A protein has these predicted regions:
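Extracytoplasmic copper-binding redox domains, predominantly the cupredoxin/blue-copper superfamily
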Residues: 17-107
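Cleavable N-terminal signal peptides
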Residues: 6-7, 17
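Positively charged n-region of N-terminal signal peptides that target proteins for export
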Residues: 1-4
């Protein structure tokens, strides 16, 4: 029993941080869904390309968080870890003018 408890404690502290999924181009629309989320510092946002055309993630205030490589195929993903608290506006480079924008609130 002592070893089982130790194993549970170890697993609890080694579990990865939660990830929040954000769809890109869902339903063929030029949108992020959801386009506004709130997460805790250290959490991962998992961006998923749901449809053509290509998309990317630009965080203008923090270029180090941007994922400028284009995701061409449905199902391609990019992960971004937000370590610092703040509000992060982001957009898809090719589709910003069409309104493909969002904001991530990190607490």
């Amino acid at each position: 029993m002592k070893y089982f408890f130790a194993l549970l404690i170890t697993l609890f502290f080694t579990m990865p941080a939660w990830a929040v999924d954000v769809s890109m181009g869902s339903g063929g629309n030029l949108v992020f869904e959801p386009d506004e989320i709130t997460i805790s510092a250290g959490e991962t946002v998992h961006f998923i390309n749901e449809a053509l055309p290509p998309h990317n993630i630009i965080v203008e205030a923090r270029p180090d968080l941007s994922r400028e490589a284009l995701l061409f195929a449905p199902g391609e993903t990019q992960d971004v870890v937000f370590a610092d608290a703040g509000d992060y506006e982001f957009f898809c480079g090719p589709h910003q003018g069409a309104g493909m924008t969002g904001v991530i609130h990190v607490q």
